[in-house]
């Protein structure tokens, strides 16, 4: 029974992780277009030079593009890498403005942002699970063998 469960989980783990991450990114990406003010508020407290709507819209568009790549399976290592960057950027708020996050006793904003650590780990797994693509020249070539 354990082997059956493990094998089933292995079959669905990759697609399930990619699609879940895509749904999360799409959702938060769309919300940045609906109301950018919560993100602008966080940026105002942490990185005021980025606290304007156009930057938030750019983040939202990036999240939507990455969500599309994750769902379609296109350029997975790069989609994962950009996702790691998005979540790493969010996590910098803990370092830059601990007063916003309440580190180490987390505020509500800190609790909300902490989930990005798990999402970043999921993005690293997307990179790790992406099929490796070697250039054709790097592949070993078959060597003809003479039969005597």
Specify the residue positions occupied by each region the protein language model found.
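Membrane-interface extramembranous regions
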Residues: 1-148
């Amino acid at each position: 029974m354990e082997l059956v469960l493990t094998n089933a989980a292995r079959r669905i783990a990759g697609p399930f992780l990619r699609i879940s991450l895509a749904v999360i990114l799409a959702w938060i990406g769309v919300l940045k277009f609906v109301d950018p003010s919560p993100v602008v508020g966080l940026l105002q407290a942490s990185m005021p030079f980025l606290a304007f709507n156009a930057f938030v819209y750019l983040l939202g568009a990036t999240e939507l593009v990455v969500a599309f790549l994750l769902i379609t399976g296109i350029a997975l290592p790069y989609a994962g890498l950009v996702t790691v960057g998005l979540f790493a950027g969010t996590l910098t708020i803990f370092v830059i403005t601990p007063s916003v996050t309440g580190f180490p006793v987390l505020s509500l904003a800190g609790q909300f942002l902490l989930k990005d650590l798990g999402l970043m780990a999921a993005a690293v797994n997307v990179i790790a699970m992406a099929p490796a693509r070697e250039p054709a020249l790097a592949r070993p070539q078959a060597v003809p063998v003479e039969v005597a």
